[in-house]
Amino acid sequence: MDFRLSTGSNLPREALGKLLYDIICDVLVMELSFDEIEVKDWSDSRHISIGFTYFSISINLDDEDDYIERYRKLNLETYGVDTNVDINIQFIARTFDIGWLKLLEVIGKLLRLNDQDLVVEDDSSYPLLKRIKGCLFINSNLDEFQTECMGKEKLELLNYPYLEKDFLKDNGHEK
């Protein structure tokens, strides 16, 4: 299962990769030994990948400035979020249920670090959640699987206040 987390960041992407590694280690400190976490930094491709039992994340450090700007404008026009870093998330299917909970904890820690915009997307047309100018919105117009993933008990793992919002309705489309 593929997801994408896009965020605004003033950090260099290398520093953001290190920060994500530290957050993941903090979230999983009681569950994993450090030999279960694999970090790759391919110098020739300038790509950071962090993989472990539940999911892997990757950040492309080679993105050109014009690509980043086009991507930023697209997210601003489509979702109303100002982001400049794209983080790909690949879940391991057999551990998705636990991995999703761990990712929510990681996202919660990111939310508390700064007030930058953020959006989390799956393969649907509308994001699962987004933060705009410090306010977190959870999509209330979800399919059955998404509703299970975004239940109130699971969202408590974010440890961050949020409002529910129908992203489909608020985008001018009918359900």
Q: What kind of feature is each model-predicted range?
A:
Residues 22-27, 106-114:
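Conserved short hydrophobic interaction patches
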Residues 17-20, 97-109:
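Well-ordered, non-membrane alpha-helical segments in soluble/globular domains
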Residues 11-12, 92-99:
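Short acidic, S/G/P-rich loop/turn micro-motifs used as interaction or catalytic elements
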Residues 29-94, 132:
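Short, intrinsically disordered low-complexity segments
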Residues 1-45, 172-175:
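Short, extreme N-terminal segment that most often corresponds to the first beta-strand
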Residues 109-175:
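Acidic, proline/glycine-rich low-complexity IDRs
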Residues 8-10, 53, 142:
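Secondary-structure transition/turn motif
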Residues 5, 57-59, 87-89, 103, ...:
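Hydrophobic beta-strand residues in large extracellular and virion-surface proteins
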